[in-house]
Every structure is written in C-alpha cells, then in structure tokens.
Design a protein with these regions (language model features):
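Short metal-coordination and nucleic-acid-contact micro-motifs, chiefly zinc-binding Cys/His arrays
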Residues: 42-45, 119-122, 147-148
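Polybasic, proline/glycine-rich intrinsically disordered low-complexity segments
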Residues: 141-192
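Cys/His-coordinated zinc-binding microdomains
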Residues: 53, 127-130
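Short, non-ligating residues that shape and space the ligands of small metal-coordination modules
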Residues: 58-59, 132-136
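Short, intrinsically disordered, charge-biased short linear motifs at domain edges
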Residues: 32-40, 108-117
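Short linker/helix segments within small regulatory modules
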Residues: 64-66, 111-121, 140-142
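Accessory DNA-engaging acidic/polar modules
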Residues: 1-57, 61, 65-102, 188-192
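Short cysteine/histidine-rich metal-coordination sites, predominantly Zn2+-binding motifs
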Residues: 64-75, 139-152
C-alpha cells in the first residue's frame, strides 16, 4: 500500500505523496475526542527524568484557536469549532504524514504502549536513559510544563515548529487553567 518503516523511531509512516485513508483501519483506536485543523505546532519544554534525574526535552502537539473536535457523545457526526487553542495529550491516531514529520524531528516523542492507560499513545522518552515519560506528569500534574495553570509569563514551553498542513488525531483536549498560557503559545505558533 506504500507505508514505510522507520527502524530508528520504530514506527510505520505513510509518505506525503501516498493516500493515508487505506491505513486508518490499522491505526484507529478507542473513543477519544477526534481533533482536526489546518495547522499544528510541535511544542517543547524540559523536565528532569524520573529515572536518571537528567534534564530531557519533552514535546507536545499544539493546535491553535479554531480547531474542530468531536467526541463519542457526538456519535461521530458533529464537528464543533473551538474558541480556544489547546495542547493535546494522550494522542493516538495521528495522520501518517504527521507521524512521519514527528519521527524526522525527534526519536524521543513516539508511539509507545502505556501500562497505565492500557494502550499506545504518543509519549515522550528520556533522551539519556529512554525511560517513558507519561502524559499525566506533563499535562495533568501541577508543575508539569504543559499543565495550563501556569502564572502568566512563567511557562518555558517553546513552539519549535509550525506546520501549515492538515492535522487530525485522537487525544485529550485541555481547556481551562490560565488562558494566558494558551494565548502565549498561540502567539508563538503564529510567529514560528
């Protein structure tokens, strides 16, 4: 069908010129929220690894205001436009083009299985010891770099790359906390 294997990232991807639709049956999972937009960014921060205690880069997928989402409650029929931007967590089912793009940027943010969640999602790995760094500590735990309740101006999250191309995935959408956190990221999204 045209998929390619990246042995370093240990992931299958579909090159840009190949139609991704035939591959969805192999990458589709559960009933998470589906998100889509015409652009997205790769955000980066640093944390200390829980295992080796060395500083390591961590990554997250950010999408600006106006992204569309639908949930299992929508019966998969109604897309709602968001008035806020978001950093996604527990991301699964990214488009193959997006997976290939992420694999070309970093080998430490990749699809891997979580014993806690019971399925694979795009998770971070320590750059020194390869320990899995789960999304709870990064997105849901107070003090995590992608946790939205930072005081204005205190986040160290950088927008590394912005892509003006179709984006779609399944994952958890975060709202609330300090809207200025999202506003700052959105400004970085458009200036990257």
């Amino acid at each position: 069908l045209g998929a390619r294997w990246d042995p370093d990232a240990r992931i299958w991807y579909v090159p840009e010129r190949v139609d991704a639709k035939p591959f969805w049956r192999w990458i589709s999972t559960g009933d998470e929220t589906r998100v889509r937009n015409d652009s997205y960014s790769l955000a980066q921060a640093s944390v200390n690894c829980w295992r080796c205690h060395k500083e390591t880069d961590v990554f997250g997928l950010f999408t600006p205001t106006g992204f569309e989402c639908r949930t299992a409650e929508d019966n998969g029929t109604h897309w709602r436009k968001s008035p806020l931007p978001t950093i996604l967590s527990y991301v699964t089912d990214v488009l193959p083009d997006v997976a290939g793009q992420m694999a070309s940027i970093t080998k430490h943010f990749r699809l891997d299985t979580s014993k806690t969640r019971g399925h694979a999602y795009w998770m971070n790995h320590c750059t020194s010891c390869q320990a899995k760094i789960g999304d709870f500590a990064l997105h849901r735990d107070a003090g995590g770099p992608f946790f939205a309740a930072h005081e204005a101006g205190t986040t160290t999250v950088k927008v590394l790359y912005t892509f003006s191309k179709r984006f779609e995935c399944k994952g958890d959408v975060s709202f609330g906390g300090d809207d200025l956190f999202y506003v700052a990221l959105e400004e970085r999204h458009y200036s990257a």
